UniProtKB/Swiss-Prot annotation:
It catalyses: a UDP-3-O-[(3R)-3-hydroxyacyl]-alpha-D-glucosamine + a (3R)-hydroxyacyl-[ACP] = a UDP-2-N,3-O-bis[(3R)-3-hydroxyacyl]-alpha-D-glucosamine + holo-[ACP] + H(+). Its EC number is 2.3.1.191. CDD domains: LbH_LpxD. GO terms for biological process: lipid A biosynthetic process. SUPFAM superfamilies: Trimeric LpxA-like enzymes. This is UDP-3-O-acylglucosamine N-acyltransferase. The gene is lpxD.
Length: 343
């Protein structure tokens, strides 16, 4: 079991320690469930009243909350960020694979870096290049001439199509498909003619992709995911989409083809983004947003209807359907008022 001393926690987080620097922790835990050997954190000041009851060995908090805690403490600028760093250091998640399984099928000309692991029944096709410390989970398929950078991990049954490029330090969860055909068809008098998708997908460094997400290859140019992007489960990223540095997308979002999303955007879950539009840097779209036109300025945008009781929602829906009629009536009243003013 991995253990860290308070002194080591201070080094990891950059925090200021108070207490015995030799005390050890081995787990991260929520404040109300933490006990001996646990490290916890306080990020919301309203929970400070519970510090007196907290049984954690170490608490990470801001300087202004220090007075509420008499035990071993780490004073940090951002307790939630500190928690994330400590959780990484104490992570017990197993590797997707360890060593090269006898049942893995690896092309003779595939290039494997040092310390590569490949799980059972994985297929590595001709021309593939895997960097140092790459981990390929059981049942994965890596297509011809694909490249995967060092320290990247793929969980079970991930499919990487031909010529896809994935950078270093990425994490891809189970069942995701990268590089499948984009939705490209021409209509010839009612008959659909498939357009071969001749581009690929380029994924940068430190990108995380959730389970069962699909990222389509470009029609001619590549679909591009820049560095430090985080994509959740069950997303659909269509062909030739370009997602900028540091953007995050929770689950269920659909991005139609040839759309560009800027840097540091946050796209709420279950959003739908139209194709061939541009979203500026720093845009925050709340959940269930429907984006039909380009967004040219950063800010927070919403379009989903917040939850109501069914009775309230039915009234709202009925009024929405009467908006055009109500607008005409309002204009008629305004016209009468203006005429009376003139008289």
């Amino acid at each position: 079991m991995m253990t860290l001393t308070l002194a080591e926690l201070a080094k990891i987080t950059g925090g200021e320690l108070h207490g015995d620097e030799t005390v050890c922790v081995s787990r991260v835990a929520p404040m109300d469930k933490a006990g001996e050997g646990d490290v916890t954190f306080l990020s919301n000041p309203k929970y400070a009243v519970h510090l007196a009851e907290c049984k954690a060995t170490v608490v990470m908090l801001k300087a202004e909350q220090r007075k509420h805690c008499s035990g071993h403490v780490l004073v940090v600028d951002d307790p939630y960020v500190a928690f994330a760093k400590v959780a990484q250091a104490l992570d017990t998640t197993p590797k997707p694979a360890d060593g090269i399984a006898p049942s893995a099928v690896i092309a003779s000309d595939a290039i494997l870096g040092q310390n590569v692991s490949i799980g059972a029944n994985a297929v590595i096709e001709t021309g593939v290049s895997l960097g140092d410390n790459v981990v390929i989970g059981a049942g994965c398929f890596i297509g011809k001439n694909a490249t995967i950078g060092q320290n990247t991990k793929l969980w079970a049954n991930v499919t990487i199509y031909h010529q896809v490029q994935i950078g270093a330090d990425c994490l891809i969860q189970a069942g995701t498909v990268i590089g499948s055909d984009g939705f490209g068809y021409a209509n010839d008098r009612g008959e659909w003619i498939k357009i071969p998708q001749l581009g690929s997908v380029r994924i940068g460094n430190r990108v995380e992709i959730g389970a069962c997400t699909t990222i389509d290859r470009g029609a001619l140019d590549d679909t591009i995911i820049e560095d430090n992007v985080v994509l959740d489960n069950q997303l659909q990223i269509a062909h030739n989409v370009h997602i900028g540095y540091g953007t995050v997308m929770p689950g269920g979002t659909i991005v139609a083809g040839s759309t560009t999303i800027g840097k540091y955007c946050a796209i709420g879950g279950a959003s739908v983004i139209n194709g061939h539009i541009t979203i500026a840097d720093g845009v925050n779209i709340t959940g269930m947003g429907m984006v039909m036109r380009s967004i040219e300025e950063k800010g927070v945008y919403s379009s989903g209807i917040p939850l109501q009781t069914n009775k309230q929602w039915r009234k709202t829906a009925a009024r929405v359907h009467r908006i055009e009629e109500m607008n005409k009536r309002l204009k008629a009243v305004e016209k009468i008022v203006e005429q009376k003013k003139e008289d």
